[in-house]
């Protein structure tokens, strides 16, 4: 596997796991929602989001976990477009950590574009790519708003990197299982 793949490949490769159950959720959907909650718990972040790249049969997916402080945004669900900071190509295993000042001065910062009036605030940013075997890119895991107004730490970087690697390995297992079954 190479790290370069067409947008749209993931869905076909883990298709059985992406098929909705009776409630409309998939096992992968549930897993990725839990990943966001776990990422928040590991880093004391108020917000976590995971964007899974577009699949052949489906649009890009985005999963969230928000603290009680962000209750007004619980139903905010934009179409993930991968613009601004969200569109940065973070190499596998690397983490980007920005303070609020660094976010606002970053050349990729777009202040949420046309979503600005509805988008929850973003104070600081910690993000890494979720990659599998050989750098195969699944998506982006990102956190914002460290509790108590603090900045993300070196330890937060380590925890996010390790969680993203675990998620990448889990998605690989699903993808490889489907490939073997299809062969």
Residue ranges and their predicted role:
Residues 161-168:
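Allosteric cytosolic regulatory segments
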Residues 70-106:
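Acidic/proline- and glycine-rich, intrinsically disordered low-complexity segments
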Residues 123-132:
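A short, aliphatic-rich beta-strand micro-motif
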Residues 96, 100-124, 145-146:
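Signal-transducing coupling segments at domain and membrane junctions
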Residues 1-34, 38-42, 155, 170-183:
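Signal-transmission linkers at sensory-effector interfaces
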Residues 56-58, 131-137, 146, 174:
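Flexible loop/coil segments at beta-strand boundaries within sensory signal-transduction domains
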Residues 140-150:
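Short beta-strand-to-loop transition segments that serve as allosteric relay/switch motifs
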Residues 21-76, 174:
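Helix-loop-beta substructure at the N-terminus of cytosolic sensory domains
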């Amino acid at each position: 596997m190479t790290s370069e793949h067409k947008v749209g490949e993931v869905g076909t490769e883990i298709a059985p796991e992406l098929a909705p159950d009776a409630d409309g959720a998939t096992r992968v959907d549930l897993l990725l929602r839990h990943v966001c909650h776990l990422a928040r718990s590991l880093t004391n972040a108020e917000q976590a989001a995971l964007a899974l790249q577009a699949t052949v049969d489906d649009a890009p997916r985005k999963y969230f976990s928000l603290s009680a402080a962000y209750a007004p945004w619980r139903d905010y669900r934009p179409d993930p477009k991968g613009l601004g900071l969200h569109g940065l190509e973070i190499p596998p295993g690397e983490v980007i950590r920005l303070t609020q000042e660094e976010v606002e001065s970053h050349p990729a910062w777009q202040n949420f574009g046309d979503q600005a009036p509805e988008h929850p605030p973003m104070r600081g940013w910690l993000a890494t790519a979720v990659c599998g075997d050989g750098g195969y890119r699944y998506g982006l895991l990102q956190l914002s708003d460290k509790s108590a107004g603090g900045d993300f730490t070196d330890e937060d970087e380590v925890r996010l990197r390790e969680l993203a690697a675990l998620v990448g390995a889990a998605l690989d297992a699903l993808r490889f299982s489907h490939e073997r079954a299809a062969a």
